[in-house]
Amino acid sequence: MSQSSIIVVGGGLAGLMATIKAAESGMAVKLFSIVPVKRSHSVCAQGGINGAVNTKGEGDSPWEHFDDTVYGGDFLANQPPVKAMCEAAPSIIHLLDRMGVMFNRTPEGLLDFRRFGGTQHHRTAYAGATTGQQLLYALDEQVRRYEVAGLVTKYEGWEFLGAVLDDDRTCRGIVAQNLTNMQIESFRSDAVIMATGGPGIIFGKSTNSMINTGSAASIVYQQGAYYANGEFIQIHPTAIPGDDKLRLMSESARGEGGRVWTYKDGKPWYFLEEKYPAYGNLVPRDIATREIFDVCVNQKLGINGENMVYLDLSHKDPKELDIKLGGIIEIYEKFMGDDPRKLPMKIFPAVHYSMGGLWVDYDQMTNIPGLFAAGECDYSMHGGNRLGANSLLSAIYGGMVAGPNAVKYVNGLESSAEDMSSSLFDAHVKKEEEKWADIMSMDGTENAYVLHKELGEWMTANVTVVRHNDKLLKTDDKIQELMERFKKININDTTKWSNQGAMFTRQFSNMLQLARVITLGAYNRNESRGAHYKPDYPERNDDEWLKTTMAKHVSPYEAPEFEYQDVDVSLITPRKRDYSKKKVAK
């Protein structure tokens, strides 16, 4: 048998951790990224990473962390993998510490932990307000050790175009495009790990990087992978409104004592503290977002009648703010011109994260043999709503599980991708070259960026904080209209190298497919759970909807087929969420 290898698509935390774990066992890894890996969206994460290390003597434990996570996710997550993640969390934090991550420390020299939403405990390890950057850089240093050893090869500036599937629908490699010279090539591999992040750009403006189109996940969904719980999109309660994008103001601002308020009857009204005395400003994100939305949109009590409320840190010690929140204070000063140490920040909710993603089993493998997924592009850990600072944990943990399981899968194969006929790979390349030629020759009257703006406006208006069935159906009609208009796009720039417009057009067609999964998944789910809220169905309905949504692609112009899979609630019995009272110890 020839030399086996694994391909990892995506260079964020999940992709880098999967690469490290696979290379650790001596497996050759090709790492593909659409941007230099240090620019992956993980670099934008601010607040921290959760783990019940319990240095504060609060009686915290991995079980408490597990309970907070499934409770915060409104019981839609399968419990065994979540429990395993929470049990691994303290050792992941210590591993990162040993890798040299500059975590903040207490005066005694212990790791410091801050409080985040949906918990009563201080369990979030952090490196100022740039935790994602510090973790990403530390993991990249480890990957570079394996690069030097000849085990890892990086392909930065390559876009994933599809998995190579053989006659048995088993994954045997990928097709990718070099974004400098636009050459399309195939790469053989015995397993592929998708770590391509979320689809925030489907909503137009979001807190996500412009590369987070969901295009790669959409491609493998169109190739037959199930897409699970797509309708669960997290809207972060605190972001700076902007004309181009929405800039995240981390939950750590509230974790360090920031207060959310607006004026009511001429006096400051701390509405979260009033309604949820036990958790105050640190209720889970879906709840904080709905309250801010209600205050601004329904009660018309936003600042000066605009859709904004205050996030106030001005009562805190400025020196402490610089040490613990320097990253976000700098961002706010740069883009708003005000000093958050002296004046309250103005914020409003923004599309932030997808709890849904590619369906995976407990080994992080999709329903396509040999195709794994980890990080935000898989659905497995967060149920109906993610707790703050669980994303960095789930990305790293997902990579830690996917890497070794991909190696195990490869070692159990009878035939290697290297033994496959080259005609299989040539056929996949030819198909992608034809698609690219079709895009480059588009000569209609529509503009892909205008169509994308329309999609974003419709999705943000109707498929975010509050959802109504009639509006969801109209949104689906709009997506189908955009699919028709897509055929009439004009590619004015036919440059043969580094062609951004044509690239975006191709990604946009994939975004439209996922937009239907999100919209119709939301339409079908007649209940309110986590981030999915329907005023016409205000209660959670476990009898009918304690189920994972699984979308299956039919054809480009047909609606997806939906199946539903029971959630594994074997460890903690579902109970109603109530954040106005403290959690009763179990």
Curated annotation (Swiss-Prot):
Active site residues per record: 285 (proton acceptor)
Binding residues annotated for substrate, in chain numbering: 236, 250, 352, 386
Biological process, per Gene Ontology: anaerobic respiration; tricarboxylic acid cycle
Pathway participation: Carbohydrate metabolism; tricarboxylic acid cycle; fumarate from succinate (bacterial route): step 1/1
Disulfide bonds: none
Enzyme category, top tier: oxidoreductase
Recorded consequence of changing residue 48 to D: In a defective mutant
UniProt keyword annotation of Oxidoreductase present: yes
GO terms under cellular component: membrane raft; plasma membrane
GO function term, MF aspect, one: steroid dehydrogenase activity, acting on the CH-CH group of donors
Residues annotated as transmembrane: none
Tele-8alpha-FAD histidine: residues carrying this PTM: 41
Leader sequence segment: none
Membrane topology: Peripheral membrane protein
Catalytic activity: a quinone + succinate = fumarate + a quinol
Cofactor: FAD
EC number: 1.3.5.1
Subunit structure: In B.subtilis succinate dehydrogenase forms part of an enzyme complex containing three subunits: a flavoprotein, an iron-sulfur protein and cytochrome b-558. Interacts with FloT.
Family designation: Belongs to the FAD-dependent oxidoreductase 2 family. FRD/SDH subfamily.
Protein name: Succinate dehydrogenase flavoprotein subunit
Naturally occurring in which organism (per UniProt): Bacillus subtilis (strain 168)
